[in-house]
């Protein structure tokens, strides 16, 4: 689905000089809020900053573990295939894309922008990932450009993986601030059943506080549809 107004210049950008690339890379690499990587079509990682490695592979991960390798060598194949397909589409069309996923229990939005650097054989794709809490709309995040928006079919729920599909649905609605009665109506269940699910969620996550459960749901950006997505 294409989002945003039409702009013929999107993705055309022109070639970046080496000095511009160096300055851009230095700025992005040091941004503590952004995970950044550079890919070739096919998903070969040319470069990544430490933040991206930690977002997707944990606090002890480093870029050296990914650079020079294909995504299929690093991540579960079914997830890697999804990401590579977005990279390849960006490179082929010259248009950017926004990819949403849940990874290690947190919602991540990744902006992919194709460009053609000087002295390169072809198009490369710059990927910038950020953690986004709650259900912020991509149209509001990126209102001025035309882009394709994708939700990955495969997610990594992290600590939430212990929950059943129904429990994830209940947790997602808790994160939206719904009461037990409202959740019961939305899921066509009794209030008693919803409270039982909520108690089970609390026991599994070792959290007996409704507000804290809602915060966890918001951190993951949980939506009802996420409950039935394929898990890693």
Question: What feature does the model see in each segment?
Answer:
Residues 2-24:
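Short, charged amphipathic alpha-helical "coupling" segments at sensory-output junctions
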Residues 16-58:
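Sensory modules in modular signal-transduction proteins
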Residues 45-143:
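Sensory/regulatory domains in signal-transduction proteins
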Residues 142-169:
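Regulatory hinge/linker segments at domain boundaries
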Residues 157, 202-232:
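Basic, Lys/Arg-enriched C-terminal extension of HTH/homeodomain DNA-binding domains
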Residues 167-174, 213:
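Short alpha-helical "packing" element that flanks the helix-turn-helix/winged-helix DNA-binding module
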Residues 177-212, 216:
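Recognition helix of helix-turn-helix DNA-binding domains
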């Amino acid at each position: 689905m294409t989002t945003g107004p039409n702009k013929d210049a999107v993705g055309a950008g022109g070639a970046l000089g080496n000095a511009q690339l160096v300055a851009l890379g230095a700025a992005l690499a040091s941004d503590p809020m952004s995970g950044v990587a550079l890919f070739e079509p096919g998903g070969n990682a040319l470069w990544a900053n430490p933040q991206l490695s930690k977002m997707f592979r944990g606090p002890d991960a480093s870029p050296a573990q990914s650079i020079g390798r294909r995504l299929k060598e690093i991540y579960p194949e079914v997830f890697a295939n999804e990401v590579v397909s977005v990279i390849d589409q960006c490179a082929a069309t010259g248009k950017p894309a926004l990819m949403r996923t849940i990874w290690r229990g947190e919602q991540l939005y990744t902006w992919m922008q194709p460009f053609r650097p000087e002295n390169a054989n072809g198009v490369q794709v710059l990927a910038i990932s950020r953690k986004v809490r709650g259900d912020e709309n991509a149209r509001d995040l990126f209102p001025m450009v035309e882009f394709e928006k994708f939700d990955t079919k495969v997610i990594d729920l992290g600590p939430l993986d212990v929950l059943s599909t129904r429990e994830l649905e209940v947790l997602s609605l808790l994160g939206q601030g719904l009461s037990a009665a409202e959740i019961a109506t939305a899921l066509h269940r009794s209030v008693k059943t919803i409270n039982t699910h909520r108690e089970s969620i609390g026991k599994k996550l070792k959290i007996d506080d409704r507000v804290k459960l809602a915060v966890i749901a918001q951190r993951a950006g949980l939506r009802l549809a996420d409950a039935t997505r394929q898990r890693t």
